[in-house]
Amino acid sequence: MANTAQARKRARQAVKQNAHNSSQRSTLRTAVKAVRKAIEAGDKTAAAQVFLASVSTIDRIADKKIIHKNKAARHKSRLAAALKALA
C-alpha cells in the first residue's frame, strides 16, 4: 500500500501504463498472427502487404520500448524468412 502522495500517484500511473502497454503487446501479437495467416493462405502478394504493415507496427512498438529492439528484429526476420519460403 502506497503511503505517500507520490507513491499513490505512481501506483495510479503504473496501472494506466500497464493497461496501455498490454494493449500494444496485443496489437503486436495480432500483427504477427495476421502475417502468419496470410502466409498459410499461400497468397504471396497479400502476405507481402500484410508483412509490410506488421513491420511498421513491430518497429513502432519497439521504438516505444514496449518490446526490446532485438525481439522486434527477431520477429521481422522470422516473418521475412517465412514469406521468402512461400515462393
Curated annotation (Swiss-Prot):
Chain spans, region Disordered = 1-29
Q: Which UniProt keywords apply?
A: Ribonucleoprotein, Ribosomal protein, RNA-binding, rRNA-binding
Q: What does the record give as the function of this protein?
A: Binds directly to 16S ribosomal RNA.
Q: One MF term in GO for this entry?
A: structural constituent of ribosome
Give the GO cellular component terms, alphabetically.
Answer: cytosol; small ribosomal subunit
**Residue stretches of biased makeup (Polar residues):** 20-29
Which parts of the chain are coiled coil?
Answer: none
Q: Which family does the record assign?
A: Belongs to the bacterial ribosomal protein bS20 family.
Instruction: State the encoding gene.
Output: rpsT
Q: Which GO terms describe its biological process?
A: translation
User: Does the record carry Cell division as a key word?
Assistant: no
Q: Which InterPro entries match?
A: Ribosomal_bS20, Ribosomal_bS20_sf
Keyword match rRNA-binding: yes
Q: What is the protein's given name?
A: Small ribosomal subunit protein bS20
Q: Which organism is it from?
A: Herminiimonas arsenicoxydans
